[in-house]
Structure formats: structure tokens, C-alpha cells
Amino acid sequence: MKIKLVRSVIGRPGNQVKTVQALGLRKIGDSREVSDTPAVRGMVKTVKHLLEVQE
């Protein structure tokens, strides 16, 4: 599963900032290939409004 950060984490609650960092994303436009596990899916669901996801 490929994820890309498309919106800033500035002004977001701390748990959302930490979730984005845990997914390995730092700046807008960063993308990463992540494993498709239930844990990662839950993290993506938490910050889905900040990400672009490709299955």
C-alpha cells in the first residue's frame, strides 16, 4: 500500500502528528510504501484526511 502526505500536520492534535511520524512521513509530498496490516490500516484511518492512499 502506498501512502502520500498531502496536507500539513500543523495545528493538528498531537496523536495525529505522532501517527503521521510513525508512518514515516515528514513533509507534504512525502510518500512511502507500507505493509498492508491491520495496525497500519488503523493508523491510516486515523489520519485519512491528511493522506492520499493507493492500494
Curated annotation (Swiss-Prot):
* Keyword rRNA-binding listed: yes
A molecular function (GO) held by this record is: structural constituent of ribosome
Q: Which UniProt keywords apply?
A: Ribonucleoprotein, Ribosomal protein, RNA-binding, rRNA-binding
Provide GO CC annotations from the record.
cytosolic large ribosomal subunit
Give a GO biological-process term.
translation
Q: List the disulfide bonds.
A: none
Q: Does the keyword Phosphoprotein belong to this entry?
A: no
What is the annotated quaternary arrangement, including any partners?
Part of the 50S ribosomal subunit.
Q: What does this protein do?
A: Binds the 5S and 23S rRNAs.
Protein family according to the UniProt entry: Belongs to the universal ribosomal protein uL30 family.
Identification of the protein by name: Large ribosomal subunit protein uL30
